[in-house]
Amino acid sequence: MVMTNVAAGSALRVDEVRKSFAVPDAPGTRLLVLDGISFSMAAGELVSLVGPSGCGKSTLLRLIAGLDLPDAGDLLVGEEEILGPSAERGLVFQDPNLFPWLTVRRNIEAGLVARGVLHEKRHEVDEFTRLVGLGAFGSAYPHHLSGGMSQRVALARALINHPKVLLLDEPLGALDAFTRMRMQDEVLRLWENRRTTMLLVTHDIDEAIYMSDRILVMTRAPGRIDRTIDIKLLRPRDRTSDSFLRLRSQILEHLHFAGKAADV
């Protein structure tokens, strides 16, 4: 297999990926959503994906998660081709999708149950419950939790499988502004603790700048990578600094041209 435009030895490689969907009311017609997407991620890197609404960001995440297959191109984690779902790729959505009849601890265990390794790994449940700051809430049920706490459970459930890549599909999008900023710090703390490779889809430009090593800017559909922006600001980052605000203006300008003033 020959990989183009991507780095060999990467944690995640996406090479010339195309994806289309059938148009229900037009037999034989397909809508091209992704058109030649290529990028790679180094192990331990945190990268954000931004772009106009409908440009295919979530579709791309589904392909990397193995929930759907591309029409063309290659997706690899390490040297292994992505052909379906795997515990090597964790996925966290905007909705935490907790089981309401299970406690926090049991919800986190669900990640191990799905892999059939609960018996061998049960000792890690307490570790990950504490890791996300919920050590005192292991016996609580989802209806006792705030939105931010629920997302912490979802993160722990994904991380307990020790994924090589964690995919985050707007996981903080439903939270209020204050909680969202606190959870950004929480995700960064988990990332610094575990150094898990993370790919974050977000509509929040400030969030992307605050959290990421790099930002990939997509065009409107059919989605392509328009440009890559390296974020060289030291952490912790100051959202009010001149350098932060300059980056924000730069990215918004790129998005304006990439999306022709589409809603971002």
Model-identified regions with their sequence ranges:
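Conserved catalytic segment of ABC-fold P-loop ATPases
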Residues: 211-217
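Short hydrophobic beta-strand elements within the C-terminal catalytic ATPase subdomain
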Residues: 77, 217-218
